[in-house]
Amino acid sequence: MTTIDMNQDLGKHIHLIGIGGISMSAIAEILLNQGYRVSGSDMNDSNIINKLRAHGAEIFIGHNEDNVKDPDLVVYTAAIKEHNPERMAAKERNIPQIDRAEMLGIIMKNYKKAIAVSGSHGKTTTTSLISLIMEYSNLDPTIMVGGELDEIGGNIKIGNSEHFITEACEYVESFLKFYPFIGIILNIDEDHLDYFKDLNHIKEAFRKFINLIPQEGFLIANGDDANVQEILHSIECNLITYGLDSSNTFVARNISFTNDGYPIFTVDFKGESMGTFELNIPGKHNIYNALASIATAYLLGVEPSEIQNHIKKFRGIHRRFDILGEVKGCKIVDDYAHHPVEISATLEAAKNYPHNKIWCVFQPHTFSRTKALLEDFSRSFTNADHIIITDIYAAREQDTGEVHSEILANMIQKNNMHSQVRYMKDFEDIAAYIYDHMEPGDLVLTMGAGNVYQIGQKILQRHNE
C-alpha cells in the first residue's frame, strides 16, 4: 500500500465540505483507507455517503458551523465559497483550509507513476478505459474516476502499486495543482467561459499543465486537434501523439463500424502494426479516447495483444451512451454530453446505432455556457429527428435573464428545418409526450450534465404502470 505522506502539522482529522461529490468522496475513501479520521458534510444524502459512513466517516447533511468540530484540516470543493458557514467557522478557529484540487495533488505526489487525464471532452471514458486495461494487466493502480464504473464498484479503487490515475479538469485551473508523470491531453475546446476569458486563456492553462510533467515524464496528446497542436512547442518532457493522421506516433487506420455502431480499427505505432482493436462503446470520438488509452498502456509495458483483449471488455460507464432499457421497441439511452462538440459526437454515434427516428432531449447546463456557445449549440443537433429542449440546469449559477431555453429551441429549429424542435419544461410532460409519440425502432437519447436522465427513467416507469 502506498502511504500518503501528509504534512504532519495537519494532524489526523480531515473535514471535507461537499464530501458527497464524485471526486471528494474518492478523496475521503483514500484518506479513510490510510487511517485518517474523516468527517464531512453535503447538502443531500446519497448511496456514496452511506458507503463512506459504512467505512467510518462522520457525515452531516446540510452545511452548519457546528459540523466543524475539531478537524486539523478543512477541504472544500470549488462550489463552496468563502461565505459557507463551515468555511467561516474554520477561519474563525484558524483551521487550515485547502481546496479539493490541492488535496488531490498531495495524494498524487506520493505515487511515482501518476497519470492525469485532461481535455475538454472524454476524460471520464478515457480514464475508465486506461484504468481497466491497467487493472486487467495486474498493474493494480489506484483509480479515481469521475463517474460510476461497474468494474471497480463505483468511482474509486485503491490499489497497491506506484500507479495512480485520475481525471484532470481545467476548470478554475485546478489541474495545475497536480503532479503527473504521464499527462494526457485529449482535446481543447471553448468551455467553462464563466472562468476563462477566451480560448487562448484555456490553451494557456493547458500549456501550464504540460509544464508540470517532469523531463523524464510523458505527454500523450491528440495530434489531430488543432488547439492541442498549437501548445506542443518547446516541450521538455517526452512527447507521444495519437490520431488518424499518419504523422502521429500512434495512428488508427482501416476504420469500420459494426451493425451496432461499435468501431473496429487497426493501430500503427511508429509505422509498425499493433493489430486490430475492437470497441464495445459507440462513436468515432471513442476511437480517439481508445488511442490515448492504447498509447498509455503500451507506455506502461502492456503488450499489444493484452491491450486488444482488455479494451473490448470495456462497455462504458454510467451516463456515457448508457442504455437504460427498452420500451415499446425503443431503446432509451442517456448521455452526459453538455457541450456542442459532445452533443455532435454523441448524435453521430447514435446515427450509427440501429434506429428508426432519433429523439433527443437536451438539458442545457449552466447559463454562462449556454449564452457563450448559443450559436454552436444551435448547430449541434443535425442528426436528431425530434428535439426537445428543457429548462437550463443552473448548477452553481444564478439566472440573470440573459438566455433562455426557448431561445435555443428556436435557433435549433432555424438550423434544422428537417427536425421537429420544441421547448418543454416539465419532465413528466416530456416523458408522456415521447411515450405517446415514439414508434418501434426509435432511439430516445437524453443528454446533459444535470438531472435530465430522470426523463428516461420516467418513460420506462410509465411503461410499467
From Swiss-Prot:
Record-level GO cellular component terms: cytoplasm
InterPro entries: Mur-like_cat_sf (IPR036565), Mur_ligase_C (IPR004101), Mur_ligase_C_dom_sf (IPR036615), Mur_ligase_cen (IPR013221), Mur_ligase_N (IPR000713), MurCDEF_pg_biosynth (IPR050061), UDP-N-AcMur_Ala_ligase_MurC (IPR005758)
Subcellular location: Cytoplasm
Function, as annotated: Cell wall formation.
GO molecular-function terms, A-Z: ATP binding; UDP-N-acetylmuramate-L-alanine ligase activity
Catalysis performed (reactions): UDP-N-acetyl-alpha-D-muramate + L-alanine + ATP = UDP-N-acetyl-alpha-D-muramoyl-L-alanine + ADP + phosphate + H(+)
Alphabetized HAMAP family for the sequence: MurC
Gene designation per UniProt: murC
Keywords: ATP-binding, Cell cycle, Cell division, Cell shape, Cell wall biogenesis/degradation, Cytoplasm, Ligase, Nucleotide-binding, Peptidoglycan synthesis
KW Cytoplasm (keyword) present: yes
UniProt EC number: 6.3.2.8
Chief location: cytoplasm
Binding site for ATP: G119, S120, H121, G122, K123, T124, T125
Name of this protein: UDP-N-acetylmuramate--L-alanine ligase
Family: Belongs to the MurCDEF family.
Pfam families reported in the protein's UniProt record: Mur_ligase, Mur_ligase_C, Mur_ligase_M
GO biological process terms held by the UniProt record: cell division; cell wall organization; peptidoglycan biosynthetic process; regulation of cell shape
Biological or metabolic pathway of the protein: Cell wall biogenesis; peptidoglycan biosynthesis
